[in-house]
Regions:
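C-terminal motif of bacterial Sec signal peptides marking the signal peptidase cleavage site
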Residues: 15-16
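Early extracytoplasmic/domain-onset interaction patches
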Residues: 23-64, 151
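Non-catalytic architectural context of zinc metalloproteases
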Residues: 71-80, 85-250, 254-262, 281-283
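Juxtacatalytic substrate-recognition/specificity segment
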Residues: 216-343
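Acidic/His/Gly-enriched intrinsically disordered linker/tail segments
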Residues: 326-334, 338-413
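Amphipathic alpha-helical substructures
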Residues: 398-399, 403-410, 414-463
Length: 463
Protein backbone atom coordinates (compact mmCIF):
# COMPACT_ATOMS: atom_id res chain seq x y z
CA UNK A 1 0.00 0.00 0.00
CA UNK A 2 1.19 3.50 -0.73
CA UNK A 3 -0.58 6.55 0.66
CA UNK A 4 -0.15 10.01 -0.79
CA UNK A 5 -0.22 13.02 1.49
CA UNK A 6 -0.90 16.14 -0.53
CA UNK A 7 1.13 19.23 0.24
CA UNK A 8 -0.65 22.08 1.97
CA UNK A 9 -0.52 24.20 -1.17
CA UNK A 10 -2.02 21.48 -3.32
CA UNK A 11 -4.61 20.64 -0.69
CA UNK A 12 -5.73 24.27 -0.67
CA UNK A 13 -5.95 24.21 -4.43
CA UNK A 14 -8.06 21.08 -4.35
CA UNK A 15 -10.31 22.49 -1.55
CA UNK A 16 -10.85 21.52 -0.40
CA UNK A 17 -35.27 -7.21 -2.84
CA UNK A 18 -37.21 -10.05 -3.83
CA UNK A 19 -36.50 -13.66 -2.71
CA UNK A 20 -37.76 -16.71 -4.57
CA UNK A 21 -36.95 -20.40 -4.57
CA UNK A 22 -33.20 -20.90 -4.62
CA UNK A 23 -31.13 -23.66 -6.13
CA UNK A 24 -30.26 -26.92 -4.39
CA UNK A 25 -27.24 -27.54 -2.18
CA UNK A 26 -23.78 -27.13 -3.69
CA UNK A 27 -20.15 -27.41 -2.74
CA UNK A 28 -18.91 -24.02 -3.90
CA UNK A 29 -19.87 -20.44 -3.09
CA UNK A 30 -21.87 -18.82 -5.90
CA UNK A 31 -22.07 -15.02 -5.65
CA UNK A 32 -24.15 -12.62 -7.75
CA UNK A 33 -23.68 -8.84 -7.66
CA UNK A 34 -26.42 -6.74 -9.28
CA UNK A 35 -25.08 -3.47 -10.69
CA UNK A 36 -28.18 -2.89 -12.82
CA UNK A 37 -30.90 -2.40 -10.22
CA UNK A 38 -29.13 0.03 -7.90
CA UNK A 39 -31.48 1.54 -5.32
CA UNK A 40 -30.63 4.39 -2.95
CA UNK A 41 -26.95 3.99 -3.85
CA UNK A 42 -26.97 0.36 -2.67
CA UNK A 43 -26.15 -2.85 -4.50
CA UNK A 44 -27.80 -6.22 -3.87
CA UNK A 45 -25.52 -9.20 -3.33
CA UNK A 46 -26.85 -12.78 -3.33
CA UNK A 47 -24.79 -15.77 -2.23
CA UNK A 48 -25.72 -19.41 -2.80
CA UNK A 49 -24.10 -21.14 0.15
CA UNK A 50 -22.11 -24.38 0.21
CA UNK A 51 -23.39 -27.38 2.17
CA UNK A 52 -23.20 -27.23 5.97
CA UNK A 53 -23.39 -30.20 8.32
CA UNK A 54 -23.44 -28.03 11.45
CA UNK A 55 -26.51 -26.48 13.06
CA UNK A 56 -25.11 -22.97 12.83
CA UNK A 57 -23.00 -21.15 10.27
CA UNK A 58 -21.09 -17.90 10.63
CA UNK A 59 -21.06 -15.41 7.76
CA UNK A 60 -18.40 -12.70 7.76
CA UNK A 61 -17.47 -9.49 6.01
CA UNK A 62 -13.76 -8.62 6.46
CA UNK A 63 -12.54 -6.47 9.31
CA UNK A 64 -9.20 -5.92 7.60
CA UNK A 65 -7.63 -6.85 4.28
CA UNK A 66 -4.01 -7.53 3.29
CA UNK A 67 -1.90 -4.47 2.59
CA UNK A 68 -3.93 -1.94 4.59
CA UNK A 69 -2.65 -2.43 8.17
CA UNK A 70 -5.79 -0.90 9.67
CA UNK A 71 -9.10 -2.15 11.07
CA UNK A 72 -11.69 -0.95 8.56
CA UNK A 73 -14.74 -3.06 9.49
CA UNK A 74 -16.29 -3.46 6.04
CA UNK A 75 -19.33 -4.89 7.80
CA UNK A 76 -20.31 -1.28 8.59
CA UNK A 77 -21.31 -0.90 4.96
CA UNK A 78 -23.54 -4.00 4.85
CA UNK A 79 -27.23 -3.96 5.77
CA UNK A 80 -30.43 -6.00 5.58
CA UNK A 81 -28.62 -9.35 5.83
CA UNK A 82 -31.02 -12.26 5.31
CA UNK A 83 -30.72 -16.04 5.10
CA UNK A 84 -33.06 -18.50 3.34
CA UNK A 85 -33.57 -22.21 2.83
CA UNK A 86 -34.04 -23.81 -0.60
CA UNK A 87 -37.77 -23.02 -0.56
CA UNK A 88 -37.25 -19.34 0.16
CA UNK A 89 -38.20 -19.55 3.84
CA UNK A 90 -36.32 -17.22 6.16
CA UNK A 91 -33.78 -18.64 8.58
CA UNK A 92 -32.98 -16.98 11.89
CA UNK A 93 -29.89 -14.78 11.68
CA UNK A 94 -28.14 -13.07 14.61
CA UNK A 95 -25.61 -10.27 14.35
CA UNK A 96 -22.54 -11.22 16.40
CA UNK A 97 -20.55 -8.04 15.83
CA UNK A 98 -20.12 -5.38 13.18
CA UNK A 99 -18.69 -7.90 10.71
CA UNK A 100 -20.18 -11.30 11.56
CA UNK A 101 -23.57 -13.05 11.59
CA UNK A 102 -24.69 -16.40 13.01
CA UNK A 103 -27.21 -18.34 10.90
CA UNK A 104 -29.41 -20.97 12.58
CA UNK A 105 -30.51 -24.26 10.94
CA UNK A 106 -27.43 -24.10 8.77
CA UNK A 107 -28.05 -27.57 7.33
CA UNK A 108 -31.00 -25.95 5.53
CA UNK A 109 -29.10 -22.85 4.44
CA UNK A 110 -29.29 -22.16 0.72
CA UNK A 111 -28.95 -18.43 0.21
CA UNK A 112 -27.74 -15.24 1.91
CA UNK A 113 -28.61 -11.77 0.62
CA UNK A 114 -27.65 -8.26 1.71
CA UNK A 115 -27.27 -4.70 0.51
CA UNK A 116 -23.91 -2.96 0.14
CA UNK A 117 -23.24 0.74 0.64
CA UNK A 118 -20.07 2.23 -0.82
CA UNK A 119 -17.27 3.94 1.09
CA UNK A 120 -16.28 6.77 -1.27
CA UNK A 121 -19.31 8.97 -0.65
CA UNK A 122 -18.92 9.13 3.13
CA UNK A 123 -15.18 9.77 3.41
CA UNK A 124 -14.34 12.68 5.70
CA UNK A 125 -11.01 13.40 4.06
CA UNK A 126 -8.90 13.86 7.20
CA UNK A 127 -5.14 13.61 7.08
CA UNK A 128 -3.18 10.43 7.64
CA UNK A 129 -4.47 8.77 10.81
CA UNK A 130 -6.95 11.59 11.46
CA UNK A 131 -10.16 9.81 10.43
CA UNK A 132 -11.73 6.36 10.29
CA UNK A 133 -12.07 6.48 6.50
CA UNK A 134 -11.39 3.36 4.52
CA UNK A 135 -8.32 4.15 2.41
CA UNK A 136 -9.89 4.93 -0.98
CA UNK A 137 -7.87 2.42 -3.06
CA UNK A 138 -9.15 -0.25 -0.64
CA UNK A 139 -12.67 1.18 -0.70
CA UNK A 140 -15.75 0.85 -2.87
CA UNK A 141 -17.70 3.09 -5.22
CA UNK A 142 -21.32 2.81 -6.35
CA UNK A 143 -22.25 5.45 -8.91
CA UNK A 144 -25.15 3.97 -10.86
CA UNK A 145 -24.63 3.92 -14.60
CA UNK A 146 -21.20 5.61 -14.33
CA UNK A 147 -18.70 3.79 -12.16
CA UNK A 148 -18.43 0.85 -9.79
CA UNK A 149 -15.15 0.21 -7.99
CA UNK A 150 -15.43 -3.36 -6.83
CA UNK A 151 -12.79 -4.06 -4.26
CA UNK A 152 -14.45 -7.39 -3.67
CA UNK A 153 -13.70 -7.57 0.05
CA UNK A 154 -16.26 -4.76 0.37
CA UNK A 155 -18.96 -6.69 -1.49
CA UNK A 156 -18.38 -10.40 -0.93
CA UNK A 157 -18.28 -12.19 2.39
CA UNK A 158 -17.21 -15.67 3.47
CA UNK A 159 -18.42 -18.46 5.75
CA UNK A 160 -16.25 -19.57 8.65
CA UNK A 161 -14.65 -22.98 7.84
CA UNK A 162 -15.42 -22.48 4.12
CA UNK A 163 -12.64 -20.01 3.30
CA UNK A 164 -10.89 -22.57 1.08
CA UNK A 165 -14.05 -23.34 -0.91
CA UNK A 166 -14.02 -22.32 -4.61
CA UNK A 167 -15.95 -19.17 -5.54
CA UNK A 168 -17.95 -18.32 -8.64
CA UNK A 169 -18.79 -14.64 -9.11
CA UNK A 170 -21.46 -13.34 -11.50
CA UNK A 171 -21.73 -9.59 -12.04
CA UNK A 172 -24.82 -8.28 -13.83
CA UNK A 173 -23.99 -4.83 -15.18
CA UNK A 174 -25.27 -2.14 -17.59
CA UNK A 175 -24.25 -2.86 -21.17
CA UNK A 176 -22.76 0.65 -21.34
CA UNK A 177 -20.13 -0.22 -18.74
CA UNK A 178 -17.10 -2.45 -19.13
CA UNK A 179 -15.52 -4.36 -16.27
CA UNK A 180 -11.72 -4.44 -16.27
CA UNK A 181 -9.85 -6.90 -14.07
CA UNK A 182 -6.88 -9.23 -14.07
CA UNK A 183 -9.44 -12.04 -13.89
CA UNK A 184 -10.71 -13.63 -17.09
CA UNK A 185 -14.41 -13.17 -17.86
CA UNK A 186 -15.91 -16.58 -18.68
CA UNK A 187 -19.15 -15.20 -20.14
CA UNK A 188 -19.36 -13.61 -23.60
CA UNK A 189 -22.46 -11.55 -22.77
CA UNK A 190 -22.14 -7.76 -22.72
CA UNK A 191 -24.47 -7.60 -19.70
CA UNK A 192 -22.98 -10.29 -17.47
CA UNK A 193 -19.47 -11.22 -16.37
CA UNK A 194 -18.54 -14.52 -14.74
CA UNK A 195 -15.34 -15.10 -12.79
CA UNK A 196 -14.01 -18.01 -10.76
CA UNK A 197 -11.46 -18.23 -7.95
CA UNK A 198 -9.98 -21.15 -6.07
CA UNK A 199 -10.82 -19.68 -2.65
CA UNK A 200 -12.04 -16.53 -0.91
CA UNK A 201 -8.59 -15.00 -0.41
CA UNK A 202 -7.88 -15.36 -4.13
CA UNK A 203 -11.19 -13.78 -5.13
CA UNK A 204 -10.76 -10.64 -3.04
CA UNK A 205 -7.29 -10.08 -4.48
CA UNK A 206 -8.94 -9.48 -7.88
CA UNK A 207 -10.60 -6.02 -7.95
CA UNK A 208 -12.84 -5.03 -10.87
CA UNK A 209 -13.64 -1.52 -12.08
CA UNK A 210 -16.76 -0.92 -14.17
CA UNK A 211 -16.98 2.28 -16.18
CA UNK A 212 -17.43 3.58 -19.70
CA UNK A 213 -14.81 1.69 -21.74
CA UNK A 214 -11.48 3.51 -21.55
CA UNK A 215 -8.54 1.16 -21.40
CA UNK A 216 -5.31 0.25 -23.13
CA UNK A 217 -3.16 -2.85 -23.11
CA UNK A 218 0.42 -3.60 -24.03
CA UNK A 219 2.94 -6.40 -23.62
CA UNK A 220 6.09 -6.24 -21.53
CA UNK A 221 7.98 -9.38 -22.49
CA UNK A 222 5.38 -12.11 -21.88
CA UNK A 223 3.24 -10.08 -19.47
CA UNK A 224 0.08 -8.26 -20.57
CA UNK A 225 -0.48 -4.90 -18.85
CA UNK A 226 -3.99 -3.43 -18.86
CA UNK A 227 -4.64 0.18 -17.82
CA UNK A 228 -8.24 1.23 -17.18
CA UNK A 229 -9.09 4.86 -16.38
CA UNK A 230 -12.21 6.46 -14.95
CA UNK A 231 -12.13 10.25 -15.34
CA UNK A 232 -15.52 11.74 -14.36
CA UNK A 233 -15.23 14.81 -16.60
CA UNK A 234 -13.24 13.06 -19.30
CA UNK A 235 -10.18 15.19 -18.56
CA UNK A 236 -7.82 12.24 -18.90
CA UNK A 237 -7.87 9.05 -20.95
CA UNK A 238 -5.97 5.80 -20.75
CA UNK A 239 -4.35 6.63 -24.08
CA UNK A 240 -2.80 9.80 -22.61
CA UNK A 241 -1.44 8.05 -19.54
CA UNK A 242 -0.23 4.83 -21.13
CA UNK A 243 3.05 5.94 -22.83
CA UNK A 244 4.50 7.21 -19.55
CA UNK A 245 3.30 4.14 -17.66
CA UNK A 246 4.58 1.76 -20.32
CA UNK A 247 8.06 3.27 -20.17
CA UNK A 248 8.06 2.96 -16.39
CA UNK A 249 6.82 -0.64 -16.31
CA UNK A 250 9.32 -1.77 -18.92
CA UNK A 251 12.03 -0.33 -16.69
CA UNK A 252 10.59 -2.13 -13.66
CA UNK A 253 10.40 -5.44 -15.46
CA UNK A 254 14.01 -5.04 -16.63
CA UNK A 255 15.12 -4.17 -13.08
CA UNK A 256 13.35 -7.22 -11.63
CA UNK A 257 14.61 -9.60 -14.30
CA UNK A 258 13.11 -13.06 -13.82
CA UNK A 259 11.28 -12.21 -10.60
CA UNK A 260 7.75 -11.68 -11.91
CA UNK A 261 5.85 -14.59 -13.46
CA UNK A 262 2.32 -13.20 -13.70
CA UNK A 263 0.92 -13.22 -17.23
CA UNK A 264 -1.60 -10.42 -16.75
CA UNK A 265 -1.46 -7.26 -14.65
CA UNK A 266 -4.25 -4.67 -14.36
CA UNK A 267 -3.92 -1.05 -13.23
CA UNK A 268 -7.30 0.40 -12.27
CA UNK A 269 -7.08 4.20 -12.04
CA UNK A 270 -9.96 6.11 -10.48
CA UNK A 271 -9.75 9.90 -10.73
CA UNK A 272 -11.76 11.61 -8.02
CA UNK A 273 -13.86 14.70 -8.70
CA UNK A 274 -13.05 15.86 -5.14
CA UNK A 275 -16.72 16.65 -4.51
CA UNK A 276 -18.02 16.06 -0.96
CA UNK A 277 -19.29 12.59 -1.92
CA UNK A 278 -16.22 11.37 -3.77
CA UNK A 279 -12.96 9.67 -2.80
CA UNK A 280 -10.43 11.67 -0.80
CA UNK A 281 -7.71 9.15 0.06
CA UNK A 282 -5.02 9.19 -2.60
CA UNK A 283 -2.54 6.44 -3.32
CA UNK A 284 -2.72 2.79 -4.32
CA UNK A 285 -3.25 -0.73 -3.00
CA UNK A 286 -1.38 -3.78 -4.26
CA UNK A 287 -2.72 -7.16 -5.31
CA UNK A 288 -0.81 -10.10 -6.82
CA UNK A 289 -1.91 -9.25 -10.36
CA UNK A 290 -3.34 -5.75 -10.12
CA UNK A 291 -3.22 -2.34 -8.47
CA UNK A 292 -6.08 -0.02 -7.58
CA UNK A 293 -5.14 3.66 -7.73
CA UNK A 294 -7.06 6.77 -6.65
CA UNK A 295 -5.88 10.27 -7.56
CA UNK A 296 -7.55 13.71 -7.82
CA UNK A 297 -8.70 14.48 -11.36
CA UNK A 298 -7.78 18.15 -10.90
CA UNK A 299 -4.06 17.32 -10.99
CA UNK A 300 -2.08 18.49 -13.98
CA UNK A 301 -0.89 15.76 -16.34
CA UNK A 302 2.79 16.08 -15.42
CA UNK A 303 2.09 15.88 -11.69
CA UNK A 304 -0.31 12.97 -12.21
CA UNK A 305 2.32 11.08 -14.19
CA UNK A 306 4.93 11.63 -11.49
CA UNK A 307 2.57 10.46 -8.75
CA UNK A 308 1.60 7.40 -10.78
CA UNK A 309 5.25 6.58 -11.36
CA UNK A 310 5.96 6.55 -7.64
CA UNK A 311 2.82 4.85 -6.32
CA UNK A 312 2.27 2.30 -9.09
CA UNK A 313 5.92 1.28 -9.09
CA UNK A 314 5.70 0.80 -5.32
CA UNK A 315 2.63 -1.44 -5.68
CA UNK A 316 4.14 -3.39 -8.56
CA UNK A 317 7.23 -4.15 -6.49
CA UNK A 318 4.99 -5.79 -3.90
CA UNK A 319 5.22 -8.74 -6.29
CA UNK A 320 8.56 -9.31 -4.57
CA UNK A 321 7.29 -8.94 -1.02
CA UNK A 322 4.89 -9.76 0.56
CA UNK A 323 3.24 -11.38 -2.48
CA UNK A 324 6.18 -13.76 -3.05
CA UNK A 325 8.31 -13.59 0.11
CA UNK A 326 6.14 -13.52 3.23
CA UNK A 327 5.51 -14.96 6.69
CA UNK A 328 2.86 -17.36 7.95
CA UNK A 329 0.80 -14.38 9.11
CA UNK A 330 0.48 -13.26 5.48
CA UNK A 331 0.10 -16.73 3.97
CA UNK A 332 -2.76 -17.63 6.31
CA UNK A 333 -4.29 -14.19 6.61
CA UNK A 334 -7.30 -14.02 8.92
CA UNK A 335 -9.67 -11.33 7.65
CA UNK A 336 -11.42 -10.91 11.01
CA UNK A 337 -8.82 -11.85 13.61
CA UNK A 338 -5.54 -10.88 11.99
CA UNK A 339 -2.15 -11.71 13.42
CA UNK A 340 0.34 -9.18 12.09
CA UNK A 341 3.90 -9.92 11.00
CA UNK A 342 7.06 -8.36 12.47
CA UNK A 343 8.50 -7.55 9.08
CA UNK A 344 6.90 -4.40 7.72
CA UNK A 345 10.47 -3.16 7.25
CA UNK A 346 10.61 -5.68 4.39
CA UNK A 347 7.02 -5.67 3.06
CA UNK A 348 6.83 -1.89 2.81
CA UNK A 349 10.38 -0.67 3.41
CA UNK A 350 12.18 -2.84 0.84
CA UNK A 351 9.33 -2.21 -1.59
CA UNK A 352 9.63 1.57 -1.16
CA UNK A 353 13.40 1.38 -1.57
CA UNK A 354 13.02 -0.59 -4.81
CA UNK A 355 10.47 1.95 -6.08
CA UNK A 356 13.19 4.60 -5.83
CA UNK A 357 16.25 2.50 -6.63
CA UNK A 358 14.91 1.18 -9.94
CA UNK A 359 14.36 4.72 -11.18
CA UNK A 360 18.03 5.65 -10.87
CA UNK A 361 19.13 2.16 -11.92
CA UNK A 362 17.11 2.39 -15.13
CA UNK A 363 17.89 6.04 -15.88
CA UNK A 364 14.45 7.47 -15.09
CA UNK A 365 15.97 9.92 -12.59
CA UNK A 366 19.48 11.26 -11.96
CA UNK A 367 21.65 10.07 -9.06
CA UNK A 368 21.29 13.42 -7.31
CA UNK A 369 17.49 13.05 -7.36
CA UNK A 370 17.78 9.60 -5.77
CA UNK A 371 20.05 10.91 -3.01
CA UNK A 372 17.68 13.82 -2.40
CA UNK A 373 14.79 11.40 -1.98
CA UNK A 374 16.67 9.28 0.52
CA UNK A 375 17.82 12.41 2.39
CA UNK A 376 14.18 13.46 2.65
CA UNK A 377 13.37 10.08 4.16
CA UNK A 378 16.10 10.59 6.77
CA UNK A 379 14.57 13.95 7.66
CA UNK A 380 11.03 12.59 7.79
CA UNK A 381 12.05 9.54 9.83
CA UNK A 382 13.73 11.83 12.38
CA UNK A 383 10.31 13.18 13.34
CA UNK A 384 9.10 9.69 14.29
CA UNK A 385 9.83 7.62 17.40
CA UNK A 386 13.31 6.30 16.62
CA UNK A 387 13.53 4.39 19.91
CA UNK A 388 10.55 2.16 19.11
CA UNK A 389 11.48 -1.33 17.94
CA UNK A 390 10.53 -1.59 14.26
CA UNK A 391 9.61 -5.26 14.54
CA UNK A 392 7.52 -4.58 17.65
CA UNK A 393 5.77 -1.72 15.86
CA UNK A 394 5.01 -4.02 12.94
CA UNK A 395 3.63 -6.78 15.13
CA UNK A 396 1.34 -4.34 16.95
CA UNK A 397 0.58 -1.92 14.11
CA UNK A 398 -3.20 -2.16 14.56
CA UNK A 399 -3.11 -0.51 17.99
CA UNK A 400 -1.64 2.59 19.59
CA UNK A 401 1.01 3.80 20.17
CA UNK A 402 2.36 1.68 17.32
CA UNK A 403 -0.38 2.54 14.83
CA UNK A 404 0.62 6.20 14.65
CA UNK A 405 4.15 5.14 13.69
CA UNK A 406 3.02 3.10 10.68
CA UNK A 407 3.88 5.80 8.14
CA UNK A 408 7.52 5.38 9.14
CA UNK A 409 7.62 2.13 7.14
CA UNK A 410 8.00 4.30 4.02
CA UNK A 411 10.76 6.37 5.60
CA UNK A 412 12.85 4.40 8.08
CA UNK A 413 11.77 1.14 6.44
CA UNK A 414 13.26 2.26 3.12
CA UNK A 415 16.40 3.45 4.92
CA UNK A 416 16.79 0.05 6.60
CA UNK A 417 16.56 -1.54 3.16
CA UNK A 418 19.18 0.84 1.76
CA UNK A 419 21.57 0.14 4.65
CA UNK A 420 21.10 -3.59 4.14
CA UNK A 421 21.77 -3.14 0.42
CA UNK A 422 25.00 -1.26 1.15
CA UNK A 423 26.10 -3.88 3.69
CA UNK A 424 25.52 -6.76 1.26
CA UNK A 425 27.34 -4.94 -1.55
CA UNK A 426 30.34 -4.23 0.69
CA UNK A 427 30.61 -7.82 1.90
CA UNK A 428 30.25 -9.25 -1.62
CA UNK A 429 32.58 -6.76 -3.31
CA UNK A 430 29.64 -5.40 -5.25
CA UNK A 431 28.59 -8.79 -6.63
CA UNK A 432 25.30 -8.91 -4.73
CA UNK A 433 22.73 -6.51 -3.34
CA UNK A 434 19.34 -6.56 -1.69
CA UNK A 435 17.61 -7.51 -4.95
CA UNK A 436 19.71 -10.68 -5.05
CA UNK A 437 18.83 -11.31 -1.40
CA UNK A 438 15.12 -11.09 -2.22
CA UNK A 439 15.67 -13.44 -5.17
CA UNK A 440 17.42 -15.90 -2.85
CA UNK A 441 14.57 -15.65 -0.34
CA UNK A 442 12.12 -16.21 -3.19
CA UNK A 443 14.01 -19.35 -4.20
CA UNK A 444 14.02 -20.51 -0.59
CA UNK A 445 10.32 -19.88 0.03
CA UNK A 446 8.30 -18.56 -2.92
CA UNK A 447 4.63 -17.60 -2.97
CA UNK A 448 3.44 -21.03 -1.73
CA UNK A 449 5.80 -21.39 1.23
CA UNK A 450 5.88 -18.98 4.15
CA UNK A 451 8.68 -18.30 6.60
CA UNK A 452 8.33 -18.13 10.37
CA UNK A 453 8.53 -14.57 11.66
CA UNK A 454 11.21 -15.33 14.24
CA UNK A 455 13.45 -17.17 11.74
CA UNK A 456 13.78 -14.56 8.98
CA UNK A 457 16.84 -12.71 10.28
CA UNK A 458 18.73 -15.98 10.75
CA UNK A 459 17.84 -17.02 7.20
CA UNK A 460 19.03 -13.66 5.82
CA UNK A 461 22.33 -14.06 7.68
CA UNK A 462 22.69 -17.60 6.33
CA UNK A 463 22.08 -16.50 2.75
Amino acid sequence: MKKIILTLALASFLFGCKTGTTTSKQNDVDVTIDLVNVKEDKVLVSILAPTFTTETATFNIPKIVPGTYSDDDYGKYIEDVKAFDAKGNSLRITKLDVNSYSISDATKLSKVTYLVNDTYDIEKGGGFGESDDVFSPAGTNIDAGKNFMLNLHGFVGYFTTKEETPYKLTVNHPTTLLGVSAMNDLDASDAKDVFVASKYASLVEMPIMYSKPDFTSFMVDDMEIIISVYSPTGKYTAKEITPYMENMMRAQKKFLGKFNATKKYAILLYLSSMTPTDAKGFGALEHPTSTTVVMPEVMGLEMLQEQLKDVVSHEFFHIVTPLTVHSNEIQNFDFNNPQMSEHLWMYEGVTEYFANLFQVNQGLIEEDAFYERMAEKIEQASSMNDKMSFTKMSKNVLKEPYKEQYINVYQKGALIAMCLDIEIREKSNGQKGILQLMQDLSNEYGSKKAFKDNELFAKITEL
